[in-house]
Amino acid sequence: MILRRKPIVPDAVTAGLDTVGMRCPAHEVTRAIIAAAGVPVAAPSGNTSGRPSPTSAADMLEDMDGKIDCIVDGGPCTVGVESTIIDLTLTPPRLLRPGGVTLEQLRDALGEVDVD
């Protein structure tokens, strides 16, 4: 989800933009790590820009070997497609990238949704 940035959100999280991207992971291990942190977690994508998103720890290692300290292996992804990106700063909201959440699901939840 792309949302309007609130003043409390640091520049480092938004690259100085007036918007912020927020992801809501479904994976139980990821959610447990975020809950254990006790604060919102800011993190980059799990892939090098321009490369496909990894769907397993092996995929992650292939792309990130030597660039990161560790990988938490929670098993393979169940969806296997890119995350849906929806811009909620616009009226009506605009679907920028389809993914695991379908346009139909978004329209069921939000009503009118434009498509980029």
Model-inferred region functions:
Residues 1-116:
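Active-site-adjacent structural elements in enzyme catalytic cores
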